[in-house]
């Protein structure tokens, strides 16, 4: 079962793409068949390469909350890790700042 903060591979693509689930627990529990996500890029990118990113230490990678997307829950595979509550909060703050 997908939960808030999970990092999961996309199963609707031929490429190896990962996303982090930004939907809160209420949205996930509502079981709408959709979740709010953003891309997760495995590995490190240079600190000055992009603005509005969130660095993740385990698994090592970067969230791109500026590129928020709705996906069907069925498009996600088994989670490979989680971003943690601090990183999830930071990503949600970036998304909120972009639309307020």
Describe the function of each predicted region.
Residues 9-53:
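Compact nucleic-acid interaction/catalytic patches
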Residues 56-100:
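C-terminal terminal-subdomain/extension
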């Amino acid at each position: 079962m997908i939960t808030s903060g999970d990092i999961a591979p996309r199963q609707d693509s031929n490429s190896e793409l990962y996303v982090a689930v930004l939907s809160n627990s209420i949205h996930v529990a509502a079981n709408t068949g959709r979740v709010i996500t953003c891309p997760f890029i495995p590995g490190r990118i240079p600190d000055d390469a992009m603005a509005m990113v969130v660095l993740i230490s385990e698994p090592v990678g970067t969230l791109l909350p500026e590129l928020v997307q709705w996906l069907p829950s069925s498009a996600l595979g088994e989670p490979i890790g989680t971003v943690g509550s601090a990183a999830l909060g930071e990503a949600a703050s970036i998304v909120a700042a972009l639309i307020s």
